[in-house]
Amino acid sequence: MSNTGITLALSKGRIFDETLPLLAAAGITPAESPESSRKLIIGTNRDDVRLIIVRASDVPTYVQYGAADLGIAGKDVLNEHGGRGLYQPLDLQIAKCRMMVAVREGYDYAGTVKQGARIRVATKYVNAARDHFASKGVHIDLIKLYGSMELAPLVGLSDVIVDLVSTGGTLKANGLAAVEHICDISSRLVVNQAALKLKRSVIQPVVDAFAAAVAR
């Protein structure tokens, strides 16, 4: 990408699908769908804009190091990354869900916390979990997992989990229940701070178009 062109980092799935109307508002149409193409670099109807398809958890890193000028990432991912080198101008209000503490049915979470007992927590959101329980004065042992979080309490790996919840259907199907709300999650637009200075004439109109679309 030239000094006048921009690269936008996106992940497949729900975030990409819900970003399409925002891209359209900015006059950007992907040449292909990442769901049907194996390409990781996708052109658009604009010669000065291209998309790169990366793992959701990697979006902030690509933007931080300048491999992408902009990206769209969930608040959960940004919390774990730390936000270094990133400007976060806009909450896009897409891919909404909640970060929750969940337990197996029958586990006395409130009683355990009240007694001051140490709790074993399984999650991939270790920073968010650590901060949440520290704010409550609860001592925990953290176990980092990358998937199938619901299994951990069922097989005795953990007492509780911290995970994202949309409808709660997956928790219920596995005999778990959400017991505590940590924070609301949605996706944010992130911009490389250096790129914003160097390419403001190209980046700012995209940011403004996204903002206008969100405000509608």
Swiss-Prot record:
Pfam families: HisG (PF01634)
GO CC annotation, single: cytoplasm
Subcellular location as annotated: Cytoplasm
Gene Ontology MF annotations: ATP binding; ATP phosphoribosyltransferase activity
Pathway noted in the entry: Amino-acid biosynthesis; L-histidine biosynthesis; L-histidine from 5-phospho-alpha-D-ribose 1-diphosphate: step 1/9
Catalysis: reaction(s): 1-(5-phospho-beta-D-ribosyl)-ATP + diphosphate = 5-phospho-alpha-D-ribose 1-diphosphate + ATP
Gene3D superfamilies: Periplasmic binding protein-like II (3.40.190.10)
UniProt entry keywords in alphabetical sequence: Amino-acid biosynthesis, ATP-binding, Cytoplasm, Glycosyltransferase, Histidine biosynthesis, Nucleotide-binding, Transferase
Top-level enzyme category: transferase
Entry keyword Methyltransferase: no
Key word Amino-acid biosynthesis present: yes
GO annotation, biological process: L-histidine biosynthetic process
Major localisation: cytoplasm
Subunit structure: Heteromultimer composed of HisG and HisZ subunits.
This protein's name: ATP phosphoribosyltransferase
Organism, as annotated: Thiobacillus denitrificans (strain ATCC 25259 / T1)
